[in-house]
């Protein structure tokens, strides 16, 4: 749970502020994000519709199938159960047409407007209206909002954290299970949850919470397993076998002429090292660290050296970062938010350079070259800046949170 000083700050803010403004701004921002990319360029949403549902037959996404009029066999979707269910159900609202993939993208993005509004609501309840608004207008978050369906997993994860803070443990476990069944990333939250219960000498409660979450997860997944186990398991097999991919630390190093040898082995070493450092942070802190704060650092460590850096990862990091920033005093918040803004700009620049680099290579030597063109070196430098600033922001946040805990402890002692 949150510290008493944190709870008092939030309660005082919530008495004075309503969430309406944050929700409205979030929804307006999400609508503008649709107009920024109204055809869904570089979005999995339109791509997966074309690969799996374009013939209007609405075939089960966790099956090997062939579209009408095609001879190419399509593999199951490489997403967890609930994401596949969402993309399948939404396909029923779109009639086959020449540009049906655009209609499908816009329908899905329109639903995301509502989800983004609810996300802002929970962020406000867990931090403050100002911080929720800052998240809602974060440029890199909006730029990546409709790349795929991650918002469907992020919202229940944040809801689970909120319910945990409210001591509604069973509901929290259920929504965390929903999040894991939608994306699987939130599984990393088990680390800060386990440490939280361990440091509070409540190991039995911790085992029950994690066990209950996994039971809920299993209950959500069993129907999919029974329908087509191979189709259901395809995502997990695909993720395990996935090679080092685009926009990762490994690719950026290669682009800059410093390839990392034995990348597959180094991938595991770096991840274990990063998670080990987070574990040290969680266990050696002067006070028990909240689930919200701990989940940010664990998620950051998990994403930092991922095999592939997908652009929507910034939504996970930004939403959790906002919750962690909420633990700081107003003065410390102001300082760290400046760095948060710089990090967001670097994320946006990196994402833009990534896509322009793809277009530059695709249309090189044609009559319609990309404009502007982004060279491999420019893309690599943008990636280096992005990764560096993300690490700097995270270290600065950890430093400020530790300093805040010490300040709160000394204030309490003096009082």
Question: Residue spans of the language-model regions?
Answer:
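Periplasmic/ER-lumenal interhelical loops and adjacent helix-loop junctions
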Residues: 224-269
């Amino acid at each position: 749970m949150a510290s008493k000083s944190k709870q008092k700050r939030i309660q005082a803010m919530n008495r004075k502020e309503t969430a309406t403004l944050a929700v409205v701004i979030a929804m307006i921002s999400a609508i503008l994000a649709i107009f920024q990319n109204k055809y869904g360029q570089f979005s999995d949403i339109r791509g997966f519709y074309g690969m799996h549902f374009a013939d209007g037959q609405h075939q089960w996404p966790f099956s090997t199938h062939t579209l009408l009029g095609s001879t190419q066999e399509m593999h199951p979707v490489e997403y967890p159960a609930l994401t596949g269910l969402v993309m399948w159900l939404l396909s029923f609202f779109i009639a086959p047409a020449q540009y049906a993939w655009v209609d499908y993208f816009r329908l899905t993005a329109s639903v995301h407007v509502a989800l983004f509004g609810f996300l802002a609501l929970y962020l406000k309840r867990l931090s403050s209206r100002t911080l929720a608004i800052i998240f809602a207008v974060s440029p890199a978050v909006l730029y990546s909002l409709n790349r795929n369906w991650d918002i469907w997993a992020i919202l229940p994860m944040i809801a689970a954290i909120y319910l945990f803070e409210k001591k509604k443990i069973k509901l929290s476990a259920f929504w965390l299970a929903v999040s894991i069944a939608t994306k699987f990333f939130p599984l990393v939250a088990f680390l800060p949850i386990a440490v939280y219960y361990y440091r509070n000498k409540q190991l039995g409660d911790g085992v029950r919470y994690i066990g209950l979450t996994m039971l809920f997860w299993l209950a959500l997944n069993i129907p999919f397993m029974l329908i087509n186990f191979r189709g259901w398991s395809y995502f997990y097999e695909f993720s395990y076998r996935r090679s080092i991919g685009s926009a990762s630390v490994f690719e950026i190093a290669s682009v800059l002429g410093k390839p990392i040898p034995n990348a597959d082995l180094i991938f595991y070493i770096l991840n274990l090292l990063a998670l080990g450092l987070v574990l040290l942070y969680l266990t050696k802190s002067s006070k028990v660290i909240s689930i919200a704060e701990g989940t940010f650092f664990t998620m950051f460590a998990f994403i930092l050296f991922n095999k592939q850096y997908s652009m929507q990862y910034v939504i996970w990091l930004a939403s959790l970062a906002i919750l962690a920033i909420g633990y700081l005093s107003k003065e410390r918040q102001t300082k760290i938010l400046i760095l948060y803004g710089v990090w967001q700009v670097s994320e946006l620049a990196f994402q833009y350079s990534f896509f322009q680099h793809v277009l530059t290579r695709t249309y090189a030597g044609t009559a319609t070259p990309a404009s502007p063109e982004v060279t491999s070196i420019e893309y690599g430098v943008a990636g280096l800046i992005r990764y560096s600033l993300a690490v700097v922001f995270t270290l600065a946040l950890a430093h400020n949170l530790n300093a805040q805990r010490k300040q709160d402890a000394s204030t309490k002692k003096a009082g």
